[in-house]
């Protein structure tokens, strides 16, 4: 079997293997999403992301929304500002985190068997008074109607360790992977998986959630598009929420 033919299977297998050997520090939120390394120059984007997980569980239940505004600054650079608005059982919803995210496209779309990019994020958690830096590669592989995306992210706490943080690592790894079948523009079935991984110095399996997803897009004319996706994810480890329902709406225009 050639490497080109095997590649649609290789990426998700690598991601799942990572989820089985790595440890979690901070769980992936219900409104998290998967990023593509492909950039549309001079395109504006407005996004609404949301999700709910185990809301009846006071320890790990959460309802969260993310509001995002972005622009394709250069042919290979897209930048956006994101605000996260979560709520846990028994608590009021509050703006928790403000994020500045950047996507850098490293390869020309379709010229190689694998499209590659770099994702970077600087964030401030205003409730915990902590700052974070995150960076990692993004991969996209297309064969026929099949498309696979893989994100791997290293995140580090920049602010000083606070009281109560003793024993917690300042570094964490996470990944997200999806497969979709481009059946038709309005509906594309697929699968998504998210894992929050842990300190690379102490590798142990902890969180992994996986489930069916669907994707779609509608052309609105005059360079305007509406994209959407949603997934129902089941927890595969004891530390993962039992069920997560997530969605993403994206309005694009030039």
Model-derived features: where do they sit?
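Cleavable N-terminal export/targeting peptides
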Residues: 1-34, 254
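Transmembrane beta-barrel domains of Gram-negative outer membranes and organellar outer membranes
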Residues: 26-254
């Amino acid at each position: 079997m050639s490497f080109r033919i095997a590649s649609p299977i290789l990426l998700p297998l690598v991601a799942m293997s990572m989820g089985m050997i790595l440890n979690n520090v901070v769980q992936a939120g219900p409104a998290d999403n998967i990023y593509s390394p492909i950039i549309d120059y001079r395109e504006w984007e407005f996004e609404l992301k949301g999700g709910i997980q185990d809301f009846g569980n006071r320890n790990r239940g959460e309802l969260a929304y993310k509001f995002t505004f972005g622009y394709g600054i250069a042919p290979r650079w897209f930048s956006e500002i994101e605000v996260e608005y979560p709520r846990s059982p028994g608590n009021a919803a509050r703006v928790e985190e403000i994020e500045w995210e950047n996507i850098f496209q490293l390869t020309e779309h379709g010229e190689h068997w694998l499209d590659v990019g770099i994702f970077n994020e600087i964030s401030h958690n205003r409730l915990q008074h902590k700052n974070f830096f995150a960076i990692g590669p993004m991969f996209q592989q297309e064969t026929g109607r099949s498309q696979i995306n893989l994100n791997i992210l290293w995140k580090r706490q920049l602010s000083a360790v606070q009281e109560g943080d003793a024993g917690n690592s300042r570094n964490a790894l996470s990944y997200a992977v999806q497969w979709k079948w481009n059946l038709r523009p309005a509906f594309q079935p697929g699968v998504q998986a998210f894992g929050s991984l842990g300190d690379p110095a102490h590798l142990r399996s902890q969180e992994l959630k996986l489930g069916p997803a669907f994707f779609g897009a509608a052309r609105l004319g005059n360079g305007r598009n509406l994209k959407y996706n949603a997934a129902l994810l089941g927890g595969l480890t004891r530390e993962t929420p039992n069920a997560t329902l997530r969605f993403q709406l994206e309005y694009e225009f030039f």
